Amino acid sequence: MIEKLAEIRKKIDEIDNKILKLIAERNSLAKDVAEIKNQLGIPINDPEREKYIYDRIRKLCKEHNVDENIGIKIFQILIEHNKALQKQYLEETQNKNKK
């Protein structure tokens, strides 16, 4: 029984590692998005895109039997963090251009 518990926990640890790698990849892409938005003169906040994401997450939660509230909370955190990264990236870019 102890071995089974250890095996399950190891799988959970592996999943956690994959989740964090995917978050890092998402963060990196957020910087790319910021650069393109800056070139196009598009604001960081995009309520239409956020609505699309939340609608999509609700649908995916149903498909994968995940509590919708948890899915939405996770993506609220990710979206807010990515917007903060985009703002930081733009500020750094603007400061470099001033020098």
Swiss-Prot record:
Q: Which residues bind substrate?
A: 26, 37, 46, 50, 86
What's its catalytic activity? Answer: chorismate = prephenate
- Biological process according to GO: chorismate metabolic process; salicylic acid biosynthetic process
Protein's UniProt keywords contain Iron: no
Q: Which GO terms describe its molecular function?
A: chorismate mutase activity; identical protein binding
Write the record's keywords in alphabetical order, separated by commas.
Isomerase
Q: What class of enzyme is it?
A: isomerase
Please name the pathway.
Metabolic intermediate biosynthesis; prephenate biosynthesis; prephenate from chorismate: step 1/1
pH dependence statement: Activity is independent of pH in the range of pH 5-9.
In terms of temperature dependence, the annotation states: Thermostable. The midpoint for its thermal unfolding transition (Tm) is 88 degrees Celsius.
Domain Chorismate mutase span(s) in chain numbering: 1-90
Sequence intervals crossing the membrane: none
SUPFAM superfamilies membership: Chorismate mutase II
The EC designation for this entry is 5.4.99.5
Q: Which purpose does this protein serve, as stated in its record?
A: Catalyzes the conversion of chorismate into prephenate via a Claisen rearrangement.
Q: What protein am I looking at?
A: Chorismate mutase
- In its UniProt entry, the species of origin is given as Methanocaldococcus jannaschii (strain ATCC 43067 / DSM 2661 / JAL-1 / JCM 10045 / NBRC 100440) (Methanococcus jannaschii)
